[in-house]
Amino acid sequence: MTHEDIVRSLLTYLRSVTACPDLAYDEAPTRMSGGFDATILRFSLQSAPDPFSGPLVLRLFQATATADRAPREGAVQNALAQLGYPAPSVFVAEARIEPLGGPFLIMERMPGRIVGSELENLSIKGLGQTLNILRQLPRIRREVLRLWDEAQTRLHAVPVKGFVDLVASAGVPPENLSFDSVFAAQRAFVEEFGLSGLRPAVDWLTANTPRQSTAVICHGDFHSSNVLADNGRLTGVIDWVKATIAEPAFDYGAVMAILATVPIRVPAGVHRMLRAMMNNLARTHSRQCGTTPETEAALRYYQVFNCLVQLVTVGKSHAQGNTTQGAYNSPVGVANLVNHVHLLTGLNLTLPG
């Protein structure tokens, strides 16, 4: 669908859902940043009934998304919101692809802006603005760490049983959120899509399971771009596709892998410095997880797992002929992941050409 098709079809869908045939947009849908595997639009409606009366977000997945994706994310976010965590409440979790060309969520739009959003200017502004931001990095770093740590600590403190009960009551089997289930899905994808060059990572992860600590609710993609704040106050955490019940190192290891590997577009002179700063941020943030040898082994393990997930995502995309550009869907992105796994394990991974 084109953007215009989505805008028109969304309004038709909402008129049906609300039984308001004259429903109209107050703020027409416009694209928001992020969402490498989804189209994200912000909008609002005129004189709409609750719960559609406030600022809204459409999160539209690709047609190839699994049938359980929208219900799963909706159940996760609503359970967290009901337990007092700042996840956006979901008002519609549509599994069918017919209305908009893919499954989708309609949810509340959280106030605030992305934590550390000033860093985005490094990739879109000139050298003068870049140097100005570099002078502000110590302040930005302190603010990012404070809000990031708060969001992470609060999530890991959410009672797992209460969360599991709410997710189950929404019709989502809680066992589907376990790390074992998530890992099994990655193993299956490797075989289904002929990604034999990733089997060494699967074998390594199977043979090197770390000593387990108490399971908590994990986000799975908890970099600061998924954390929102307003005037120094945490207001929201978004993008729950990788939510998993696992030990805390699952989240911290994922962040370490992401900040070590995600491609960054910056002037050549600041690339190395920015990468070092990102790695330092991740390492500092991960200290909340502990510094014992067992913790270090777990962080290493979940870094490798996160890289495997990213590589599988790229491999699936290529196998399905999907040209949508994701964060790692480039030669540089794949090379960063492969090199990081080699650094951690000595393995040499490959993806089909």
Question: Which residue stretches match the model-derived regions?
Answer:
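C-terminal/domain-terminus segments
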Residues: F163-V182, A298, Y302, T313-G315, ...
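Short beta-strand segments
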Residues: R59-L60, F91-V92, I217-G220, V237-I238, ...
